[in-house]
A protein has these predicted regions:
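Conserved acyl-CoA
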Residues: 104-120
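Conserved beta-strand-loop-alpha-helix junction that forms the acyl-donor binding cleft
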Residues: 93, 114, 122-133, 149-158
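Acetyl-CoA-dependent GNAT
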Residues: 41-98, 112
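Conserved active-site alpha-helix within GNAT-family acetyltransferase domains
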Residues: 103, 108, 127-145
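Conserved N-terminal entry element of GNAT/NAT acetyltransferase domains
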Residues: 1-13, 158
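Helix-loop element at the rim of GNAT/NAT acetyltransferase active sites that forms part
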Residues: 20-34
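Terminal substrate-recognition subdomain of acyl/acetyltransferases
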Residues: 2, 137-138, 142-158
Length: 158
């Protein structure tokens, strides 16, 4: 079944959904404390180039996706040396009914970022998150390195 995938800029009206999704076991496994993550999502959109969106399948919000500027961070060290033009992606699907749509969601977001003029994208899934890694590979991301906890993957526009 084909879905219409769109992205709605996150605002305060989404916070109750984000909080609920961040508490879901399948999200919590890979993301941090729900309240801390919610604060980071709200903070990021204001001052560091992070753009957060609710993922909407047809007319239903099902998760969260963001693009961010890795060059603005050095939390784990791998971000150092990346060009300011590189965009990072973070994503989770909160609604269990929407699991299995990751490839379509990521593909649509990649298309959006490429259309906006971004040519180099990175993502850093946990090494143990094999389902996410497979989805990113299906979209076209390739491994270029790793940290103690993450696989570093990139996708460059051809």
């Amino acid at each position: 079944m084909a879905y219409s995938v769109t992205f709605a800029p996150v605002n305060e009206s989404h916070h109750h959904l984000l909080r609920r999704w961040l508490r879901q076991p399948h999200v919590r496994e890979w993301w941090g404390d729900p309240e801390q993550e919610l604060k980071l999502i709200a903070h990021g959109k204001d001052d560091d180039g992070t753009e957060g969106f609710a993922i909407v399948l047809d007319d239903a919000p099902v998760g969260y996706i963001q693009s961010w500027m890795p060059s603005q961070f050095d939390n784990e060290g791998w971000e150092q040396g990346l060009s300011p033009d590189v965009r990072g992606i973070d994503v989770f699907i909160g609604e269990t009914s929407a699991l299995g749509n990751g490839v379509a969601i990521i593909s649509a977001f990649v298309h959006r970022l490429f259309t906006e003029g971004h040519d180099h994208l990175v993502i850093d899934p946990d090494k143990q998150n094999h389902r996410a890694i497979r989805a990113y590979e299906k979209v076209g991301f390739v491994r270029y390195g790793e940290t103690e906890e993450s696989v570093l993957m990139e996708l460059k526009r051809a």
